[in-house]
């Protein structure tokens, strides 16, 4: 197989795919020579970022892997070369540790005790400091499924690299493009850019950042997330989630749209990293071009993406940010959860579990409006320890307990609130 070497600020990256012709000039321009005059840094396109991240050499960017570290270092160098300041806990990096924990969703659970941890993920965090009062967070997860493992929809024999071009090299590349375009512009806000890891295992990186922020989250204006924005179709359908999380969003989306068939979703809860910020009472917008047959399969490759569409999405998001730049701090508004997964059971409490919780029970990270949990009086932070006669020790036992009930039945759910047990009557 043809091998290519990419050098960025003296870091060497090995590229394996024979389709990587776009990087010949890229590597030559970014090679840093040890001489008095530094070689100018070439601007990297959305396509070039995708082709790097989705190359076979990155082996699917699985959280905790050596190639995840390589991808993280690449992104850190990209931020550095654009002149963004580091805002992690270790330069541009924010490590977090966790141990895998099997449950019906194939997620993992964060473990705050490092001595018991088995895996370390890396968020990559960079900052544009405009000396403004508020900060806009712009994020996209860069991890994927590695060679498949849990979460893969591939049914072939043997392990194959899942490159995750759309999911989510596309979102990261658009985020990088926005970082370049926002440098020195729209200075009424600061901008924090985060490449999350651990999304595929249960929003681990974003959840960790929200609970261990490197900026004052009370000064966060709003958060924009991009996950799978690389497959814009001919009808230009673009889904935007979280539109109801601030009164300003709907009109702003409409006023700046001339190209897209917008599919607006009110809810701030969904299967991507914006959820972590919404649950911390921050307005969020999440952009998504839709599902496709290559989702979570080895066939999600870079050559299948719509790069003109990604450029257009980047411009649209920039226009939205520009429009909101003079509006000050946006108001936050809670929404109904429109995106609950259809479970294998007939009833659900209507809560968002805290997948990072590693103690006894199931801790609630969010409560959906007008659902059984809210009607019964449950709140964020409650720990469910018993459902009817069934003891809840972890996520698995919680899921199993739900299969024992029918819609319309009533039962007592015991929760711990600030260490005090409470018995609440739930109507399913």
Protein language model features and the residues they cover:
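A non-catalytic alpha/beta surface segment that caps or lines the substrate-entry region
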Residues: 61-127
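Alpha-helical metal-binding/catalytic segments enriched in His/Glu/Asp
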Residues: 126, 138-139, 149-202, 317
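His/Asp/Glu-rich mid-to-C-terminal helical/loop segments that flank catalytic regions of hydrolases
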Residues: 293-339
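PDZ/PDZ-like groove recognition
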Residues: 336-380
């Amino acid at each position: 197989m043809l091998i290519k070497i990419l050098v960025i600020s003296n870091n060497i990256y090995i590229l394996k795919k024979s389709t990587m012709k776009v990087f010949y000039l890229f590597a030559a321009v970014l090679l840093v020579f040890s001489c008095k005059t530094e070689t100018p840094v070439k601007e990297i396109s959305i396509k070039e970022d995708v082709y790097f991240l989705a190359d076979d050499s990155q082996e699917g960017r699985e959280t905790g892997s050596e190639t995840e570290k390589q991808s993280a270092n690449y992104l850190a160098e990209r931020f550095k070369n654009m002149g963004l300041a580091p805002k992690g806990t270790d330069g541009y990096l924010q490590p977090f540790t966790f141990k895998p924990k099997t449950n019906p969703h194939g997620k993992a659970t964060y473990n705050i005790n490092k001595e018991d941890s088995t895996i370390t993920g890396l968020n990559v965090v960079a900052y544009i400091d405009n000396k403004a009062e508020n900060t806009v967070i712009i994020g996209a997860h860069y991890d994927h499924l590695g060679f498949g493992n849990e979460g893969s929809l591939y049914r072939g024999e043997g392990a194959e690299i899942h490159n995750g071009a759309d999911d989510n090299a596309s979102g990261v590349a658009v985020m990088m493009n926005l970082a370049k375009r926002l440098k020195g512009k729209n200075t009424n806000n600061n901008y924090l850019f985060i490449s999350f890891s651990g999304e595929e295992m249960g929003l681990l990186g974003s959840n960790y950042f929200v609970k261990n922020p490197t900026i004052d989250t009370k000064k966060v204006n709003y958060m924009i997330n991009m996950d799978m924005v690389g497959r814009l179709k001919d009808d230009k359908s673009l889904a935007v989630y979280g539109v109801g999380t601030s009164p300003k969003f709907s009109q702003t989306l409409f006023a700046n749209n001339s190209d897209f068939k917008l599919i607006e979703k009110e809810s701030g809860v969904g299967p991507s990293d914006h959820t972590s910020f919404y649950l911390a009472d921050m307005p969020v917008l999440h952009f998504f071009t839709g599902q496709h047959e290559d989702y979570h399969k080895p066939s999600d490759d870079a050559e299948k993406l719509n790069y003109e569409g990604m450029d257009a999405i980047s411009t649209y998001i920039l226009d939205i940010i520009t429009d909101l730049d003079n509006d000050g701090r946006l108001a936050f508004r809670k929404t109904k959860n429109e995106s609950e997964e259809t479970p294998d059971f007939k009833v659900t409490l209507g809560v968002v579990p805290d997948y990072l919780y590693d103690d006894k029970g199931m801790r609630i990270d969010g409560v959906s409006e007008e659902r059984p949990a809210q009607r019964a009086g449950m709140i964020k932070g409650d720990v469910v320890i018993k459902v009817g006669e069934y003891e809840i020790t972890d996520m698995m036992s919680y899921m199993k307990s739900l299969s024992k009930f029918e819609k319309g039945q009533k039962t007592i759910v015991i929760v711990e609130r600030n260490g005090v047990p409470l018995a609440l009557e739930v109507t399913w």
